[in-house]
């Protein structure tokens, strides 16, 4: 997908990886970039507008833990204004295994709810035009960081959901792929809580190993958007972009 002249909704587009990705997206010249986030950042919004004044950038406050009905109401406002949306990026995430319910609500249920809400406008069975979803998951969904099992499980669930969305594309007209960053230098990973304090130094231990910058991750994210491969499971790690082959151990035969 060429980003130029497209309409894009980016949930959590002002976060660590999110903000650098928004910068890279704006450089590619979309028509509209609509950022949905919990907290407005006027300085960041102004910076994005300055990068490419031809791009219309709009911010709406949004908490992914609201109901599907509330999400649908906000999306209707956006669709009424833009008429069409080409790409939805679900990027909300937290890393704190003390907060079990909120981790699941943000990292998994929030992605499901926002996706469910946009189907009202995209699903071809309802006369919609289809669309593309990029879900930011994590390499911990492949192999867990066992000291943060709640976070890792929430990301594994998000990957599984995304894989199912991709297989449903012939029915819904909506394609999907997952973006799975490795350990990236963001505020998220500098300090976080392990489950039941099984490893108080988990953040320090992770950062002793090779990481990547948010810019490297963002640049590869844009490459994945441009590749636009339905069902792709992208690994963005150590400055590289690699497609992962998912191993199938069971088949439902339906």
Curated annotation (Swiss-Prot):
Source superkingdom: Eukaryota
Aminoacyl-tRNA synthetase listed as a keyword: no
GO CC aspect terms: cytoplasm
Biological-process GO terms, alphabetical: alcohol metabolic process
InterPro entries according to UniProt: ADH_Drosophila-type, NAD(P)-bd_dom_sf, Sc_DH/Rdtase_CS, SDR_fam
Enzyme class of the recorded protein, top EC level: oxidoreductase
Active site: residue positions: 151
The keyword Transcription regulation belongs to this UniProt entry's keyword annotation: no
Family of this protein: Belongs to the short-chain dehydrogenases/reductases (SDR) family.
Subunit structure: Homodimer.
This protein's name: Alcohol dehydrogenase 1
UniProt source species: Drosophila mettleri (Fruit fly)
